[in-house]
């Protein structure tokens, strides 16, 4: 149901790319947007995917400057919330012109702006983003031990 498109783990690749480098994060985020476009998804979904470049770039630059962020549960959750908020805000900004331009289904207007856009898209994206971030960390922790990368960002809660 557009503009919502919550698919569990759909942001995992972007988060793992953020753990690697800013360039990797931007290319993965842009690539997913191109993928949605080529797959024929509605334009609102494509632009929402393109907005991922913002949180991916910001988050990966922060991780590059603060590589210890992922080493404690508390700091990683604060980071997850911050990137989730940026992610949600970007997606709400993308959806608003479609909503106010009367380009949504009647069900969205029946629910109203607060429920349809702010809660469903905004808050829903923050929660979805944080779940996917947790999944990405769970995958990244063993992978980062097995694979040598130019920039090391590790997840180590027991250090």
Language-model segments: residues:
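Loop-helix junctions at membrane interfaces
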Residues: 1-159
């Amino acid at each position: 149901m557009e503009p919502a498109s919550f698919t569990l783990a759909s942001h995992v690749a972007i988060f793992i790319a953020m753990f690697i480098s800013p360039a990797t994060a931007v290319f993965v985020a842009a690539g997913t947007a191109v993928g949605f476009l080529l797959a024929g998804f509605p334009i609102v979904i494509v632009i929402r995917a393109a907005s991922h470049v913002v949180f991916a770039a910001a988050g990966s630059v922060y991780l590059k400057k603060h590589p210890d962020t992922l080493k404690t549960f508390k700091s990683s959750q604060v980071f997850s919330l911050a990137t989730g908020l940026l992610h949600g805000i970007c997606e709400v900004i993308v959806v608003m012109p479609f909503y106010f331009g009367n380009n949504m289904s009647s069900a969205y207007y029946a629910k109203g702006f607060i429920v349809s856009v702010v809660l469903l898209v905004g808050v829903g994206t923050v929660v979805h983003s944080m779940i996917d971030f947790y999944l990405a960390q769970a995958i990244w922790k063993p992978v980062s031990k097995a694979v040598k990368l130019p920039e090391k960002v590790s997840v180590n809660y027991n250090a």
